[in-house]
Regions:
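Beta-strand-rich cores of mature extracytoplasmic or soluble domains
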Residues: 104, 113-128
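C-terminal partner/receptor-binding element of secreted or periplasmic proteins
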Residues: 124-149
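Bacterial N-terminal signal peptides that target proteins for export
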Residues: 4-15
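C-terminal motif of bacterial Sec signal peptides marking the signal peptidase cleavage site
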Residues: 25-26
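Bacterial N-terminal signal peptides
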Residues: 15-22
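Central antiparallel beta-sheet cores of small beta-barrel/beta-sandwich binding domains
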Residues: 31-106, 137, 141
């Protein structure tokens, strides 16, 4: 009888530990989620801009435009690039491949409070030295006007 009692307490202890770890995991995942209000709007750096609007079902409409400025003997010059499409978002991170971009193009957008941290891998076809990578600041919460609409 004593052995059964000890065994039941041991099982209850492990069940409680398992339940507690599940709760912590769920809470940790939910802390990373962002709302539509947090992602919607216009985000800018000195030379680049993202327009973002939540479409629902973990999808975002995205439009990027960027500029790479450089000097030439004739004076200042610039390369411009843009891309648009639909991204998928999970938690606080969206993955975006602009329509018509090379297959290896991958743009990752991580929403961290008032900042948007963007990384780019692969060739995305924006133009020589034009990149989406950088840390963006939100400049508007309003629904952006998308060129594709």
């Amino acid at each position: 009888m004593l052995r059964d009692s000890t065994m039941r307490r041991t099982w209850k202890f492990w069940a409680l530990c398992l339940a507690a770890s599940s709760i912590v995991t769920v809470c940790a995942d939910s802390d990373k989620s962002v709302t539509a209000a947090q992602v919607n709007g216009t985000w800018k750096t000195k030379h680049s801009e993202f327009k973002i609007w939540a479409l629902g079902q973990l999808r975002l409409q995205i439009e990027f435009s960027g500029v790479y400025e450089y000097k030439t003997p004739q004076g200042p010059s610039a390369n411009e690039g843009e891309g648009s499409g639909v991204a998928t978002i999970e938690g606080d991170t969206a993955i975006f491949k602009p329509e018509g971009a090379e297959e290896e193009c991958r743009i990752t957008l991580k929403f961290t409070g008032a900042k948007l941290v963007v990384t780019q891998t692969g060739i995305c076809g924006f133009g020589h030295n034009v990149s989406a990578a950088g840390t963006y600041k939100k400049v508007s919460d309003m629904k952006p006007k998308f060129e594709s609409n």
